């Protein structure tokens, strides 16, 4: 039995709230159960120096956790003077995932930065950030389209969403919360597009290796979860 009493293939309650920042061109507060992430998409009408005069744009991401997003207060990374390795790895993961569905040529020489700030963490912050980050990115492109800068459907080629899966007490389960994630035998993150393309898979065995059969079960769970997330994204931006 899962601590949350959910079925093995049952996700937490998922919600997207758009337009939560009056300053950002695009914003979304995404909730995966008790994991809450504020995603804002900000437009700059320039690109990094290494992309100048290419005619292409760029999408990047930054990630952070508020000090009391966890059970005990975390020290701000700014106070430490540098980002931790985990933060850098996660924000690169988010950026790669979002870029997988963006036509940089159609975007033109502009950069969109998607900031993902964890307000409350209960497992799956990176998957929530990718899924909510797509909604914020869509809202930013919609803002640009209203000003005749781009066409959303030309720039954004597809949906992208992410979900965690793992093996908890010998059973493959979908969308792990912290109570499960902290003791799971296997922990994986799956990123897929709306058309079913695989963007990235991160999978780790905690002590005991997992079998190809178990991986197949996790993949099946992930695909069903991402199908559901994409449906919710579509409703959120309709």
Swiss-Prot record:
Reactions it catalyzes: tRNA(n+1) + phosphate = tRNA(n) + a ribonucleoside 5'-diphosphate
Residue numbers binding phosphate: 86, 124-126
Molecular function (Gene Ontology), one example: tRNA nucleotidyltransferase activity
Keyword Phosphoprotein set for record: no
Keywords: Nucleotidyltransferase, RNA-binding, rRNA processing, Transferase, tRNA processing, tRNA-binding
Domain of life: Bacteria
GO BP terms in the entry: rRNA catabolic process; rRNA processing; tRNA processing
Pfam families: RNase_PH, RNase_PH_C
EC number: 2.7.7.56
Keyword Methyltransferase: no
Family: Belongs to the RNase PH family.
SUBUNIT field: Homohexameric ring arranged as a trimer of dimers.
Function: Phosphorolytic 3'-5' exoribonuclease that plays an important role in tRNA 3'-end maturation. Removes nucleotide residues following the 3'-CCA terminus of tRNAs; can also add nucleotides to the ends of RNA molecules by using nucleoside diphosphates as substrates, but this may not be physiologically important. Probably plays a role in initiation of 16S rRNA degradation (leading to ribosome degradation) during starvation.
Stored NCBIfam families: RNasePH
Protein's recorded name: Ribonuclease PH
Organism: Brucella suis biovar 1 (strain 1330)
